[in-house]
Amino acid sequence: MALVLFSRNFIKHPRMLGSLIPSSRFLVNRLLDQVDWGRAGTIVEYGPGVGTFTGEILRRLPPEGNLVAIDTNRDFARYLTRTLRDDRLHVIEGSAADAGESLQERGLGRADYVISGIPYSTMAPELRAQILHTTHDLLQPDGAFLVYQFTRAVLPHLRQVFPHVQQEFEPRN
């Protein structure tokens, strides 16, 4: 069901999704291994889709933690709400550009981590800049923005907003 929903939405909205199929477990593990789960109180996920990362984040997240999953796609938001029943999960149908407000509305303060797979290279430059600046502002001072992409196009934009940017490659994705 998840793969069908994901693929159908890729066909309907190819610029909103970075790939025809969800991320591999290799990418999920590689990215999430960078999280210090002992200090992961609040995590924000942009573009959770069918929950490939979301489910694994919840599996690793401490009992007192919170995960705010933000997706512009109504089908994905509804799917996550139906399939991932967890009190720590807050599914929002909306824009990553409004993530700061979403955290404030839930009394969650700043995020320890923001995880994002939304395709920055296909979005309007103004929206991309707004999302990156919003993300910078909502992170704890020692927080991290973990981005996975299929191209390097977002790197110069990340470097304009974030002081320390590093990249890695996962060949098995």
Which residues are covered by each model-predicted region?
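Class I S-adenosyl-L-methionine
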Residues: 154-173
